[in-house]
Amino acid sequence: MKKLIAMLLALVMALSLVACGGGDSNTAGDDATGDKVVKIGIFEPTSGQNAGGGKKEILGIEYAYSLKPTVTINGEEYAVQLVYADNASDSAKAPTAAQTLISQGVSVVIGTYGSGCAIAAGPLFQDAKIPAIGTSCTNPQVTLGNDYYFRVGYIDPFQGAVMANFAFNQKNSSNCALIIESGDDYSAGFGNYFQQEMERLGGKATVLEFQTGETDFSTIMASVKSEGYDGIFAPVSIETAAMIISQARDAGITCPIMAGDTWDDISIAQRTGDKATEIFFSAFFDAADTTNEAGKAFVEGFTKWVAEDNARLENNGGVADVISSVTPCGYDAYMAAVGAIEAANSTEGPAIRDALAALEIPGLITGDLKFDENGDAIKNYAVIKTIQDGQIVYFSTFNGLE
């Protein structure tokens, strides 16, 4: 029955994707009153170095909310209210943001962009028995040992292997500089999986570390040149990405510069201009994929919805027709949340958690959704994107690894 309900939800979603409803993103559901309200917590960074990605995930969540602002529980309609907490891109501040959501009485949480904040907040959600649905946080530690944390995107062991295979087999980069942010869970974790797969393939990835907040990468670039590395892999934030690209090209380094899902952000192309050559990164989704029927409908509806509001446009990088792949992750996480609430016929966290564990929703934007025993989405698909003429464009597809 739970699976049937979820499938029906997906059908309703597909039929309604052409709609472009919405409201004030800062007051989503705030006008809901009475007992028939269910609160969904939005645990995302709107400040700090990951704010750009967090805002794009929130756009996906809010667009999904505009299409389905209510849920049905035991035959009665409940209004969804979105409750926001800024984790500030900081794992030290993330527990406070999580506690804010818990104290507000949310039934389920969505987020976050940035694995470190998810890892830091996870135990609080688990202790409070409030399920959380990760969006683009890819570190395995997010869900490991936490039966209340799920996620809709793929995880770093897969993503790291994809990018190592791409570097080694498609770009002939077998001796890579691995630039990571010291102490950052996402950067170190993702980099480690890239390094492991590169070594398995017969290549090498040498770690070059920098400190959080560092802006001068001249020492690292000098090492890249002197050691003759034929590729750079840099699993770093949006802000840092632009600096690494610009400083590498200014130093005369021409080798491919590669990364992961965080780089799927138009602001990187905007900030680096004609220096953004030979840039490649993995992503959850590509708007140019014409085989994705749900994706085509999403692109059409989301583009119109973003264009209707200046604040949405600003949070989307100032354009309506460019969609970061983390935005569909936000969308899919919201649909998973409301699907689980309806399948559970409850606003109680433990019941929603159990419904999530059994949930199957076909035809979401990043693919069919089903969770494994760890709460991770079962995914074996990724796209590779590049930057051309100031735009992020599709390059290739990975469907499984040998």
Predicted regions located by residue number:
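Short, low-complexity disordered leader/linker segments with a strong preference
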Residues: 1-39, 70-76, 103, 398-402
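Beta-alpha junction/loop-to-helix N-cap segments that form part of ligand/metal-binding clefts
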Residues: 24-32, 52-59, 71-143, 152, ...
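Extracytoplasmic "Venus flytrap"
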Residues: 34, 41-62, 85-91, 114-116, ...
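Short beta-strand elements at the ligand-binding edges of bilobed clamshell
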Residues: 86, 142-166, 207-209, 273-288
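An alpha-beta-alpha
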Residues: 149-212, 230-231
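Extracellular/periplasmic bilobed ligand-binding domains
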Residues: 191-288
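Extracellular/periplasmic periplasmic-binding protein-like sensory domains
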Residues: 250-329, 386-388, 392-394, 398-400
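Segments of small-molecule ligand-sensing domains
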Residues: 307-328, 338-391
